[in-house]
Curated annotation (Swiss-Prot):
Family stated for the protein in its record: Belongs to the ATPase delta chain family.
Lineage top rank: taxon: Bacteria
Principal location listed in the UniProt entry: membrane
Job of this protein: F(1)F(0) ATP synthase produces ATP from ADP in the presence of a proton or sodium gradient. F-type ATPases consist of two structural domains, F(1) containing the extramembraneous catalytic core and F(0) containing the membrane proton channel, linked together by a central stalk and a peripheral stalk. During catalysis, ATP synthesis in the catalytic domain of F(1) is coupled via a rotary mechanism of the central stalk subunits to proton translocation.
Topology in the lipid bilayer: Peripheral membrane protein
Gene Ontology CC terms: plasma membrane; proton-transporting ATP synthase complex
Subunit structure, interactors included: F-type ATPases have 2 components, F(1) - the catalytic core - and F(0) - the membrane proton channel. F(1) has five subunits: alpha(3), beta(3), gamma(1), delta(1), epsilon(1). F(0) has three main subunits: a(1), b(2) and c(10-14). The alpha and beta chains form an alternating ring which encloses part of the gamma chain. F(1) is attached to F(0) by a central stalk formed by the gamma and epsilon chains, while a peripheral stalk is formed by the delta and b chains.
Keyword annotations from UniProtKB, A to Z: ATP synthesis, Cell membrane, CF(1), Hydrogen ion transport, Ion transport, Membrane, Transport
Gene that specifies this protein: atpH
InterPro entries documented for this protein: ATP_synth_OSCP/delta_N_sf, ATPase_OSCP/dsu
Sample GO molecular function, one term: proton-transporting ATP synthase activity, rotational mechanism
Stated name of the protein: ATP synthase subunit delta
């Protein structure tokens, strides 16, 4: 069953409050991001933790424990995953985790952004871009690099709805506009 946004937010808020109360915000940022990434192909995992009888339910909960406990995920996060399995709501896990992740980042005054480039950026390049954009938006910025071959060259950064476009494509379009006026 797909949950309403308000219910997803309630789950995320409950986990956020635990993270703050237990002083686990930094740990949760890392762990929640890892969970989001590991559950990106959630359909297969969702099938593993679905059940139709009591024994399958116990097996599904055991799968959660055996999958995440060895990686030392926080017990509150593991228990939340178990609750979602028990209530057959695991399909909503990534949405809940994404809402939680956003709350955690907001709490730490960190914003997420995307840097588009024609090829994968090095850690040094990404770090330099983060620093420059952080100064522009007055917040710590975390960037994900996505490949966009339509840029021709250069980069385009999207943070908080703001676009910083240094791509050759954008420069050509600006030149085209100038020539047409």
């Amino acid at each position: 069953m797909i949950l309403k946004d308000s219910t997803i937010n309630n789950y995320a808020t409950a986990l956020f409050n635990i993270a703050v109360k237990e002083k686990l915000v930094d740990d949760y940022i890392i762990q929640v991001d890892a969970l989001i990434q590991s559950l990106s192909d959630k359909d297969d995992f969702n099938k593993l933790v679905s059940f139709s009888n009591k024994q399958e339910k116990q097996d599904a909960i055991l799968i959660i424990e055996k999958t995440f406990a060895p990686f030392e995920f926080d017990i509150y996060l593991i228990n939340a995953l178990k609750i979602l399995v028990e209530n057959q709501l695991f399909i909503n896990t990534r949405m809940i985790l994404k809402a939680l992740y956003k709350k955690l980042l907001d709490y730490k005054n960190i914003v997420l952004g995307v840097v588009y480039s024609t090829e994968k950026l090095t850690k040094t390049q990404l770090s330099a871009i983060k620093k420059k954009i952080s100064n522009k938006v007055n917040k710590k910025v975390e960037l994900v690099n996505k490949i966009d071959p339509t840029l021709i060259g250069g980069i385009k950064v999207n943070v908080q709805g703001k676009v910083f476009d240094g791509s050759i494509k954008a420069k050509l379009e600006a030149l085209k506009k100038q020539m047409n006026t």
